[in-house]
């Protein structure tokens, strides 16, 4: 939604160009997303309506999660300029240090970073051998560095606007860049769907999806995130079985798209 109470003042909203249109027109590049399965029921909302920094830090500040981020990055984005969004300053600093400990040059840019250090860190990221830049929100909106080819969501958010802004940092066109990768460790694709999907903007709050209703799913072969309704993986060609249940005898049988009449 555009605003909680805008429907009190306006009756219509002008639908303009959407992300899929910009991708088709060549103004943005598409992406491939991977999401880590995890339980986020322990996260609590703060006064701003989003998940609190405290509950997020308690969830994400685990050695296995730091190791998991580095492992997935090495597996899928080892040679790509990467921006990471973390839940708070301490988390950003510690994630950067975890990469450094693994032999990967990485910096953390936050509100506590001195102007001189910030300038040096950003220069080394954009023009030098630093592959990974960490932040909390400083680089969320307005930061434009087209060579970025990997965005890591090392946090959770219930804000669709923030979700779109963070992932959008990787969508800028650049010579030789056909797409970018998003590694989602915060379950955000389950909340908001694919960054590249069409959206119908409304003045009032959208209807909440039913509990257990899937927004996206992962391909069991290549692990990429897809629309929940996808029948074939657009990346590796895997065909999802169509399961049909016989009401008479309760026997389940798998059918593939090519087998359907």
Language-model features: locations:
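Short, basic/glycine-rich phosphate-binding loops at helix/coil junctions
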Residues: 36-54
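Long, largely alpha-helical accessory region at the distal end of helicase-like NTP-driven motors
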Residues: 74, 81, 199-261
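Conserved SF2 helicase motif VI
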Residues: 159-180
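Conserved strand-helix element at the start of the C-terminal RecA-like helicase core
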Residues: 57-102
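SF2 helicase motor core recognition
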Residues: 26, 133-151, 168-172
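A conserved SF2-helicase RecA2
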Residues: 20-29, 174-228
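Post-DEXD/H (motif II) to motif III coupling segment of the RecA-like Helicase ATP-binding lobe
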Residues: 1-33
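Conserved helicase ATPase core of P-loop NTP-dependent helicases/translocases
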Residues: 93-94, 104-140
């Amino acid at each position: 939604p555009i605003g909680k109470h805008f429907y009190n003042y306006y009756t219509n909203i002008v639908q303009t160009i959407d992300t899929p249109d910009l991708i088709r027109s060549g103004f943005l590049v598409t992406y491939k997303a991977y999401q880590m399965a995890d339980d986020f029921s322990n996260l609590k909302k703060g006064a701003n309506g989003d998940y609190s920094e405290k509950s997020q830090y308690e969830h994400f500040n685990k050695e296995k999660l730091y190791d998991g981020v580095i492992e997935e990055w090495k597996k899928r984005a080892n040679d790509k300029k990467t921006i990471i969004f973390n839940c708070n300053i301490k988390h950003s600093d510690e994630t950067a240090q975890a990469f450094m400990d693994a032999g990967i040059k990485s910096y953390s840019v936050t509100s506590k970073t001195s102007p001189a250090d910030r300038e040096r860190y950003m220069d080394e990221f954009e023009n030098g051998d630093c592959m990974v830049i960490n932040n909390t929100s400083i680089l969320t909106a307005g930061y434009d560095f087209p060579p970025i080819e990997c965005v890591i969501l090392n946090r959770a958010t219930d804000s669709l606007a923030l979700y779109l802004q963070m992932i959008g940092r990787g969508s800028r066109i650049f010579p030789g860049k056909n797409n970018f990768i998003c590694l989602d460790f915060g379950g955000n694709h389950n909340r908001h769907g694919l960054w590249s999907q069409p959206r119908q903007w409304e003045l009032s709050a959208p209807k909440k999806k039913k509990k257990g209703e899937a927004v996206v799913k992962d391909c069991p072969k290549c692990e990429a995130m897809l629309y929940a309704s996808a029948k074939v993986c657009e990346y590796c060609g895997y065909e999802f079985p169509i399961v049909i249940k016989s009401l008479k005898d309760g026997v389940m049988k798998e059918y593939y798209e090519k087998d359907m009449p």
